[in-house]
């Protein structure tokens, strides 16, 4: 889990736009965040398996 201070810092508008970075809305992870859902790959996988993300299902071929 990310520190609360990191989550607060990520929500603030940066002084320059290029300094902005994505952070998972659920756990605060900064790496591997899916922009469309604003959550990390780990949280995405858990929520997808639970069926809590509409339109997403496990691939099978």
From Swiss-Prot:
Alphabetical list of InterPro entries matching this protein: Ribosomal_uS14, Ribosomal_uS14_bact, Ribosomal_uS14_CS, Ribosomal_uS14_sf
Provide the Gene Ontology terms for cellular component.
Answer: cytoplasm; small ribosomal subunit
Q: Give the UniProt keywords, A-Z.
A: Metal-binding, Ribonucleoprotein, Ribosomal protein, RNA-binding, rRNA-binding, Zinc
- What does the record note about the cofactor? Binds 1 zinc ion per subunit.
Q: Name one Pfam family in it.
A: Ribosomal_S14
Q: Which Gene3D superfamilies match?
A: 30s Ribosomal Protein S14, Chain N (4.10.830.10)
Q: Which cofactor does it need?
A: Zn(2+)
What is the annotated role of this protein in its UniProt record? Binds 16S rRNA, required for the assembly of 30S particles and may also be responsible for determining the conformation of the 16S rRNA at the A site.
Assembly notes: Part of the 30S ribosomal subunit. Contacts proteins S3 and S10.
Tell me the protein's name. Small ribosomal subunit protein uS14
Q: Give the organism the record lists.
A: Mesomycoplasma hyopneumoniae (strain 7448) (Mycoplasma hyopneumoniae)
């Amino acid at each position: 889990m990310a520190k609360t201070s990191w989550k607060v810092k990520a929500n603030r508008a940066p002084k320059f736009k290029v300094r902005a970075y994505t952070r998972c809305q659920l756990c605060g992870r900064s790496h591997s965040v899916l922009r469309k859902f604003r959550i990390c790959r780990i949280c995405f996988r858990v929520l997808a398996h639970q069926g809590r993300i509409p339109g997403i299902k496990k691939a099978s071929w």
